[in-house]
Structures are given as C-alpha cells and as structure tokens.
Regions:
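Flavin (FAD/FMN) cofactor-binding and adjacent substrate-gating region
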Residues: 44-75, 228-251
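Flavin (primarily FAD) cofactor-binding/catalytic cores of flavoenzymes
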Residues: 1-37, 77-181, 185-400
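Charged, glycine-enriched surface loops/patches
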Residues: 40
Length: 400
C-alpha cells in the first residue's frame, strides 16, 4: 500500500498554502488531494467581488513571492478593486501551478485510523496510509439552512453556495434571507440579473464595512490611521483588528472574551460598495421567516409580522455553521475521538487536534485561533504554525 508522510485534504487557499510551505521540508513525502479552488469556482456566483482588502487577499507563500502583484505581472493584466471573484480564482489556479503542480484531483472518500497514522480511501477505491493528515476541506459542508426551510425542494429554496450564476433567475421573484455580505451581494446580483428581489433580515439595521472615516478625512488621515487601527489581514473593526491578526495571543485570552471578539469581528455586514447597487431593492429589517411551504410551483413564506410572500424562489444567505462531523470523509470513530466545542475541533499548537497528527485549517480552526482563520489572510499564520509544528523549528520565512 502506498504511504506518505503528510496528506492534505483540500486544494483551496489553505490547502495550497500549507502544501507550498511543507514542500520546503527536504525529504517530506507529501500528497495533496482535491480540485484546486473548486468551492470558489463552483459555489460562488459569477460577478461576485471579494470583500477583503487587497492586502488580505494574498495566498501565503513561504518565499512571499506568489502575491496578487506577481500574478498581475505574470498574466499581464490589471486587477480592479475590489478584486473580482473570477480573477481571484485564476490567481489561485496560477498559485497552484507555480507552487503545488502535483495536486491529485481525486476526492478523499474516507479517512480512518490506522496503526501507522491514517488510512485514506480515494473516490476510485485506491487506498494509502499517511502518517499525518491536514484537513483543509473548506466550508462547503457547513452551509446553514434554517429549520423553517427543511423539506422544501431545491426548485424553490436553496443556499447561496448552491449557485455559480444568478442569470437563471431573470424575470423571477426571489426572496433573499439574511443581512450579511452573501445575502446582500446576492440581492444586488439578482437585481442586476433582472430578478424581482426582496431582502428580509432579522437585524434592526444593516452594518456596512469601511465606513469609519468621512471622505475628506480619509484622504488627509486615512492611510496613517488605518495603519494604526487596522492590520493588513483586514479582519475585525478598528480597535481589535491588530489583536485578531495575532492568533497566538487570541487563543490565550479568556474564553468569553474570545467569543465576544469573534462575534464582533464576524457579525453580518456588507461591503460599502454594495450600497449603490442595492438601490431599488426592498430590504425589510427586523423581520424573520416563521414558516414556508410549497404553493404549486412557488413557495409561500410567512413573516413574523403576519405578512406573507408567494415567490418563485427563496435564497438563503444564512451563512455557515461549523460542525466537523459533517465532513463526510471522516470516519465515525475519528469524529468521536476528536475533542469538539460547538462543532469546532479544539486545536493546540500547529492547529493540531486531540487526535495526534490530525490538523484542521481554515474556518474550523476559528474557535481555537480566532476569526482570522475564516479568511484568506489567515493562510500565513496557519501555514507557518503547521510548518513549525511538523519540523519543530521556527519558520524563519520572509514577510509576505
């Protein structure tokens, strides 16, 4: 049976960055599984823009050289800001070709304990044993669907992650549920696709990002103040951004304070550049969906104010709820062995779980290391921490 030292499950930003860092270890037998950038390419809508700032959109590389600027130069194209989804996907694929050209695009069907570490079964039945497993499988398995919509067929109710193009909704009535970036940008894209859109959110008001300075003050003081109040990682509001950029500090804070920081940093909010695009889209605040049922080929939705809507489709911009038991490739005995909190794995140094030599990167690491792990800008910390854990040495790598 084939063996390796490390198997990485997932070929998105976290999996690719981890692989690039581990490839610097001489003699390490590394395998990477997954379709590169697949979630970004297949489960996010065409026309989307990344909410994160330019400085927070690089996939970390051990030499700090595979940046957005490097891709612009190599591809002879100029990125706009905010960064369009399609350009970021192409950047990720370029990163993969440069740093991790030998990705195995087969899916991992099962991971189970083995005497020498872990036994992996691939989708075609091939098996291998790896001494260490890095789970960088993203958030696709965690799409949250409120119970009010259980039982409704996908013809009338879907999560935003189930779409890569909203043009099919042209001429249809769509109710969008949610008040964060996903819901608001989906509402804008649907409106631009000539759908009849309404957004419903339980929030008393919408929160908009990057609105903390007036335009006049921005040009006078913006750059200086931003350097003081905001880390390049671009996670969290002024005052806590610099703290959240340091997961090694965050993880040592009292648990209740960590939870408050994570809640504040990741509360539903939209990028300010959506404001103009949402003009003409009705947005109902302080409203929740009580129930929903089929009405012929449509869906009837009941709100908590007693009103009803009968629409062609309900789009759930309701985010993601981490629960690693929903990673279908993890054998039940592994899941049972993992120490968890609210669905998150409890991790220690190197993002290692309670199962020795099994690590979790990306959003599942947020409970232990803070909300930075939910964003691309967290790849730098995660990859360096992982490398340090495996080699027993400080990374000693250049700044990005």
């Amino acid at each position: 049976m084939t063996t390796c030292d490390v198997a990485i499950i997932g070929a998105g930003p976290y999996g690719l960055s981890a692989a690039a860092h581990l490839r610097t270890v001489k003699g390490l037998e590394l395998r990477v599984f997954g379709v590169p950038m697949s979630f970004w390419n297949r489960n996010m809508p065409a026309g989307m823009f990344l909410r994160s700032a330019w400085t927070a959109t690089h996939v970390a590389h051990p030499a700090g050289c595979l940046t957005l600027e490097a891709y612009q130069a190599a591809s002879r194209q100029q990125f706009s800001t905010p960064v369009p989804l399609d350009q970021f996907v192409q950047y990720g694929l370029w990163y993969q070709r440069q740093a991790v050209p030998d990705v195995d695009q087969r899916a991992v069907a099962t991971v189970e304990p083995a005497p020498m570490g872990f036994r992996l079964y691939l989708e075609d039945g091939e098996a291998l044993v790896s001494r260490r497993v890095i789970v960088a499988a993203g958030i696709g398995a965690f799409a949250y669907r409120p119970p009010q919509f259980f039982g409704l067929p996908p013809s009338v109710a879907t999560h935003t992650s189930e779409h890569s193009d909203f043009r099919d909704f042209c001429g249809k009535s769509v109710l969008v549920v949610g008040g964060g970036q996903s819901a608001l940008e989906s509402g804008a894209l649907l409106h631009e696709a000539r759908a009849d859109v309404e957004i419903v959110t339980r929030a008393p008001r919408l929160h908009w990002l990057q609105g903390w300075l007036s335009h006049a003050l921005h040009y006078r003081l913006g750059a200086f103040i931003k350097q003081l109040l905001y880390a390049p990682t671009d996670v969290g509001p002024a005052g806590i951004s610099q703290l959240l950029a340091r997961p090694e500090i965050v993880r040592r804070l009292p648990r209740d304070l960590q939870d408050k920081l994570r809640k504040r940093a990741t509360r539903p909010a939209g990028a300010r550049w959506l404001v103009e695009r949402l003009k003409g889209v009705p947005i109902r605040l302080r409203r929740s969906v009580v129930s929903a049922e089929l009405a012929g080929e449509q869906v009837k939705v009941h709100l908590d104010d007693g009103s009803e809507r009968t629409v062609d489709h309900v789009l759930l911009g309701t985010g993601y709820k981490i629960d690693i038991s929903k990673y279908g490739f993890l054998a039940p005995e592994l899941v049972q062995s993992l120490r968890r909190s609210n669905g998150f794995p409890v991790l220690k140094d190197g993002l290692e779980s309670s199962v020795p030599r099994m690590h979790f990167l990306g959003a599942p690491a947020a409970w232990s290391f803070g909300p930075l792990m939910q964003f691309v800008s967290g790849t730098r910390y995660a990859s360096r921490s992982l490398l340090r854990c495996i080699t027993g040495k400080a990374a000693g790598l250049p700044q990005p």
